[in-house]
Amino acid sequence: MSQNPYAPPGADIEDVRRPSDEDGRFIESGHVVAAGRGASWWGEAWSLFKAAPGMWILTLLAFFVLYALVAIIPVLNFFAGFVAMLMGTGLLIGCDDLHRGDPLRVGHLFAAFKTRPGRLIVLVVVTGLLSILAMLVAVLPFGLSMLPILFGMEDMDTSLMTGTLLVSILLIFLIFLALSIPIYMAYWFAPLLIVKQDFGVGKAMLCSLKACAMNFVPFLLYGLVGLVLTIVAMIPLFLGFLILIPMIIASIYTAYRDIFFIQR
C-alpha cells in the first residue's frame, strides 16, 4: 500500500465491505442502544479525529477548495451538491479505514466516485425532491390563505396584518421542520448503508429511518452535545469548525457502527 497521503485510493477502498470479525453481527434495521450512547458517539468520533488530525484538516480544506471550484464554474455549479455529497461519503469510507487501522488520505474524497456513485446521486435527488415536497405542503395552504390579506391590505389594520403574517410564517416553519425531520432521518445513514452494505436507495433510506426513529433519545442527546460543541467551535474565530466538521462526519460513522452492529 502506498504511504503517499496524496495518492488516489487503491483497491482497499474500492472493496468497501471487507467483512471481518471486528464488524460483529450486522442488523439490517439497527437496534436500540442506551441513551448515553448519543454522547459516546462524539467521544468515539474524537478518537478517530485524533488518529490523524493533520490529515483530517488537510482533507477538509481540500474538500472546501474542490467544492468552491465546482460551485463557481458555470454549468458545473449545478452539480456542486452531488460532488459535495460524494466527497462527504468518501470521508465516511475514510472513517471506516481509520477504524480498521488504515491511514486517512486526501484521496478518500474520491472514494465514493468509484463506489456505487449512481445510487448515491439518486439518494441526493430523492432527498431533494422530498424536501421540496415538504416545503410545498408547508407553504401552499398558508400561502393561499394569505392572498386575500395581501391583496386587501388597505382594508386591514397594519398591526393585525403583521401579526397574521408572523403567525403564518411560524406555522410554515414548524410544519416544514416536522416534515423535514423524517426526511433527514431517512438520509442520515443511507450513504453508509449503500456503500458498505450494497443496499438500494429505497431500502437504505427505510432502514436509516427505522434506526433513527428507534434511537430517538440517543439522537436527542447527540444533538444537544453537538449544539454545545458548535457554540464552542464558534468562539475562536470559527476555527473550531476545522475540528468539529471532521468530528461530525466521524460521529455519523461511529453511530452507524453502534446501531447497526452487535459485537459477537
Label the predicted regions.
Residues 8, 16, 100, 161, ...:
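A generic signature of intrinsically disordered, low-complexity regions enriched in glycine/proline
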Residues 4, 220, 251-254:
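Intrinsically disordered, low-complexity segments enriched in small/polar residues
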Residues 1-44, 262-264:
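Low-complexity, intrinsically disordered extramembrane tails and loops of integral membrane proteins
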